[in-house]
């Protein structure tokens, strides 16, 4: 049975990083998965707004900041730091996201790169890693 992810947190008290990672590493509920075509294949992914729901639920008090913005070879590259408060202190992970500066897809370059960076940083805490086991 899938656990329902709500806006409510699992606990008001700080949790151990081990418990947070354990919960974020659970398979993402099917209703939170999206699909897109990439490299001739259909891939499943979690949207940035669903990633936020999981972080709010399992890692209350989390935050992120954009640490760096670069433009390299026509690509906008953002580096973010995702910070999670826990019993051990504040644990952070950094990740990058990129997007073509001139693209014709949904959204704009900076929003798309930021979304990718946030999801990648959350994956370093376990969120969505089960999607790569297929």
Regions picked out by a protein language model, each given a short descriptive name:
Residues 1-43:
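N-terminal, Lys/Arg- and Ser/Thr-rich interaction peptides
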Residues 46-134:
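Positively charged, aromatic-enriched nucleic acid-contacting surfaces
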């Amino acid at each position: 049975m899938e656990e329902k992810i709500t806006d409510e947190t699992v606990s008001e008290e700080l949790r151990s990083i081990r418990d947070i990672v354990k919960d974020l590493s659970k398979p993402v509920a099917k209703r939170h998965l999206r699909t897109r075509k990439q490299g001739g294949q259909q891939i499943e992914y979690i949207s940035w707004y669903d990633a936020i729901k999981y972080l709010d639920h399992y890692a209350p008090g989390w935050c992120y900041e954009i640490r760096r913005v670069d433009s390299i070879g026509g690509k906008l590259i953002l580096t973010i730091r995702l910070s999670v408060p826990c019993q051990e202190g504040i644990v952070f992970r950094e990740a990058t996201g990129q997007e073509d500066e001139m693209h014709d897809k949904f959204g704009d370059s900076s929003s798309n790169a930021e979304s990718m960076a946030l999801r990648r940083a959350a994956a370093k805490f376990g969120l969505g890693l089960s999607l790569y086991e297929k």
